[in-house]
Amino acid sequence: MSRTLDRRQYAQIYGPTTGDRLRLGDTALVLEVERDLTTYGDECVFGGGKVLRDGMGQAAGAPPAQVLDLVITNALVVDHAGIFKADVGVRAGRIAALGKAGNPGVMAGVTPGMIVGPGTEVIAGEGLILTAGGIDTHIHFVSPQQAAEAIASGVTTLLGGGTGPATGTNATTCTPGAWNVARMLQATDALPVNVGLLGKGNASSPEGLAEQLRAGAAGLKLHEDWGTTPAAIDACLRVAEAHDVQVAIHTDTLNESGCAEDSIAAFAGRTIHTFHTEGAGGGHAPDIIRVCGEPNVLPSSTNPTRPFTVNTLDEHLDMLVVCHHLDPSLPEDLAFAESRIRGETIAAEDVLHDLGAISMMSSDSQAMGRVGEVVTRTWQTADKMRRQRGRLPGERGDHDNLRIRRYVAKYTVNPAVAHGLADEVGSVEPGKLADLVLWRPAFFGAKPELVLKGGLIAWAQMGDANASIPTPQPVLARPMFGALGRALGATCVAFVAGAALEDGAVQGYGLSKRLVAVRGCRGLGKRDMRLNDALPRMEVDPETYEVRADGELLRCEPAARLPLAQRYFLF
């Protein structure tokens, strides 16, 4: 006996399907489901009187290698590669397959390797959005409490540097020296996120740089507060080329050792990741933003300037003074701070993100940025551009899928590619670590419902633990079993340079996390930034700070109101 369901009925039971549209949070962004990998009439649904029971959707006697440890049923996947509905299968902490799960003995179209058996746990994904765990590549490790804020926001990988609230760490994302790298790998072993450390890259000779990589750094960071001279840039990049690691750079705001063109010349066509590319967070004033037009530069933003609002300029001065050890009573320190803050370039940054010319988003945690707002600020920027610029020219249909895919790539796949993490994290595809985030559409971009680390729930919206059911207030983002005990180490990764594994010292640190070498960091270019590979010809007027891309003036008004803001965080 067959029965026909209208779209509303179907979505209520099984979640949205091909052609259905829904809004992301309270933004102006609307997605449309592009395809559905499940099978109509044979959908997997768990619960009393439902499908995933023995002999029905659950198979008996299947080979263990084909049985899933976890199935997320009927989830709406939002990834750089597409927006589609699927069952998501997890085995041994990794994504096993995307498609149709269930019992092939009685169900049509079950994807190979997606059998539901007696060893399978289930998460009901009907009506939920699933994304890859976010990656924040600009972490100042000022306090360990950042990890809780990050994972609660949907970020599962932290890459950066520091040793705690030291003056150097407050200003620069560097973990300097082999001893500090070793201690910080041991300290961050207790954090329920993947971690990679950046060593100090400021040296005009290579010896001290390579030593940090052998000790376990996953890359190097050049920062102006340590002296980002052309000689230091060249030496750091030479070491990176020899060791297949990424270099991140914060250039010389004061233009003491050279201007933007001098740093670009020092890059010499070699791959480099430019932090806070607009410049309010630091960099050649006023035209570091020019690097968005360089094919070897992988540009990112930090979230204090995301998006441009009526409050952005005012809040930056105090942040700069604190983070960079400045004295506001000294005219030269005040001039240094004020030289960075330019409404014209911040406005242009919004537009460059929308064009796909700035490829990544990050936080600058506790050093002008907010670690728990990478995801939120990304979608606020997307919303602002949707309202101010309309649909992207390449959209096909009455939706914002291209823009949504472009913006999700900025904090998932692109930072993974840039820093050599993409074999493990950054996208929802088979073989990747099951770092997955589930969202209720109304709360998308603000409050994840569940955060999985390596296939185990590590953080979740959870009610009163003394209640009779999980939902009574106060419902808060709380740590779950995946963030505890030895499960933490079994579901997280410590990223290191390949030289560290070859040297062998890092294996003696006693880490519980799996050690993974970064790879594929060199020879990258803007062309490798998914959906964010635009290479406009950039011009910056040194007097007015006006920014042009391919001759077009980049301008937008500051926002007075944003989505995903106070209404989501009253409690």
Swiss-Prot record:
Family: Belongs to the metallo-dependent hydrolases superfamily. Urease alpha subunit family.
Taxon lineage: Bacteria, Pseudomonadati, Myxococcota, Myxococcia, Myxococcales
Reaction catalyzed: urea + 2 H2O + H(+) = hydrogencarbonate + 2 NH4(+)
InterPro entries: Amidohydro-rel (IPR006680), Metal-dep_hydrolase_composite (IPR011059), Metal_Hydrolase (IPR032466), Urease_alpha_N_dom (IPR011612), Urease_alpha_subunit (IPR050112), Urease_AS (IPR017950), Urease_asu (IPR005848), Urease_asu_c (IPR017951)
Keyword Cytoplasm on entry: yes
EC class: hydrolase
Pathway recorded for this protein: Nitrogen metabolism; urea degradation; CO(2) and NH(3) from urea (urease route): step 1/1
Active site: H324
GO cellular component: cytoplasm
Listed name of the protein: Urease subunit alpha
Co-factor remark: Binds 2 nickel ions per subunit.
